[in-house]
Amino acid sequence: MIHCLADNIHSPFGNTTADNFAVLRRGAQRPTLHCLPGVPEPLCAALWPEGAIEARYAALYGAAEGLSRFEQLALLSIRAALAQTELDVSAPDCLLLLSTTKANVRWLAAAPESFVPRTGTLGETAAVIARHAGFSTVPVVVSNACISGAHALLLAARLLRQKAYRHVVVCGVDEQSPFIAAGFQSFRALSLAPCRPFDAARDGLNLGEAAATLVLSSAAPRRTVETPRAALDWCLVSGAVRNDANHISGPSRTGEGAFRALRATLPPDVSRLAFVSAHGTATPYNDEMESRALSRAALSALPVAAYKGLFGHTMGAAGVLETLLSFRAVEAGCVPPVQGFAQLGVTCPVSVSAVERPTHRRELVKMLSGFGGCNAALHFAPAPDVADAPRGFIERNWTPVAEVRLTSATCSVDGEILPLSATGEALLAAIYAEFIGGYPKFHKMDPLSRLGFVASELLLAAVRRKGHCLDENTAVVLVGHSGSQAADTRFQHTIADPDNYYPSPAVFVYTLPNIATGEIAIRNGFHGETAYFALPAFEANRVRHLVCTAGTDPETTALVGGWIECPTADRFEAHLHCYLPQAPSLRP
């Protein structure tokens, strides 16, 4: 079993999970209007007062030692959760998983040209946090848009089931900045009033910032006198990630990926579920999509909880924060109120209420969806109600059947070097024109997505030449270091000058590194798992291990993935493989 040992939420509404849940039940607070420096329009959001995070960190731990605001926030939550345990996180069987979408992206504003500080990349940021928290193992970043937190919990469970680690600390964290606010405003996705999930009058989301930490373990928790009497021994029973294969920024009209994730995750007896914790962004299309997915999964009558009417969209923190609030709700015997809801405004009926409802049931499902077409679902239940055998998990060996190596100067497929007519920034376009073609969307992609697209096209062509046919259950997993750094720098240029302020949604959407996986899924009709992970540095064995974690999903039929790094348009490398499950050996 995968047990949840300890947890914490740091948000503008409280510094413990209990405090935040109490605010949620009271329903007296909502996001408020804020003006961010350099952003012409105000935004309604759940944000800390200026300097509050730094002041709390200094009061508890002294000098911040050059840590960014983002890093201090993550450490506040991680240390608060670990203080509830007796774990020695310096042990080799402990791992930190950091779930975030943009991490230290605000640091780009100080140097929007070619220089990015040491904490400007995902991998380096995680290394700094892990070192200050006391970990000796190398951390992993999950940066998979809005589902990052849920995907990090699923990855943690898989690593624990594989016995790669004994304890995994998952911290979901994001802060708001002019970069993020400008991007969402460019999509016209923000409401100027407190948001209204699933309501007929909903007109957009609110942004929020938070850090939420959950300590998972293959060992059962030790109850102490400080353990709340109502606390349950929560276990992550099953989970899945599926792609819409539809659009990089718009949800599927049929809720395809969300439905597939639910179908792979739901328990055999859904009558045991207290409620489903929905993504509930309060945008017209997302809430409509979720209602369709719930209807297709025959869950229209199941109570729905949605938390963004209070906390806003906390992005990389959302999956962990909303899971923890759901734990507390089940322990309190209630379905939390959906703040901002008044009248149902989605096509397919779902059970949403603005008032708290009682429940005696003890299991729950968490849903999330995000840019890049990704969707996640997780099923949690208390330990006494969980069978020892995990659902949705299988151990298999995976064999590489094709390989592509691509840098800004060379390209090889299965060891055979391709003749190239260009190098540097012009190389990807040249390979596309000479060997691929026929896909105009290529020309609008950012450098990272172009690199992933070209490398995957060459790889899949080699796979087909060998007689293999990949189906829709193929997973795509990319691992890098600096994420979408090239796109981040480009978008920062569009908002740096107040007199020449022109944030573009077509540029902003590519500031999420998992978009590269979405482009590959859309091109090939892959509905399997898609993910982007980051490491502080390249390690071949770890990259392969992370890619193959998607192969523990019983529905995965093939894996496409590997290392991909593109800090600038003219400096890049990709080393991808296609893996197929190894046929079991026949016994004599």
Which residues make up each language-model segment?
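Conserved "HGTGT" condensation-loop signature of ketosynthase/thiolase-family condensing enzymes
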Residues: 1-139, 158, 177, 183-206, ...
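Short, conserved alpha-helix that lines the donor NDP-sugar binding/gating region
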Residues: 153, 157
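Alpha-to-beta junction loops
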Residues: 164-166
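Glycine-/small-residue-rich beta->alpha transition segments that form the dinucleotide
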Residues: 174
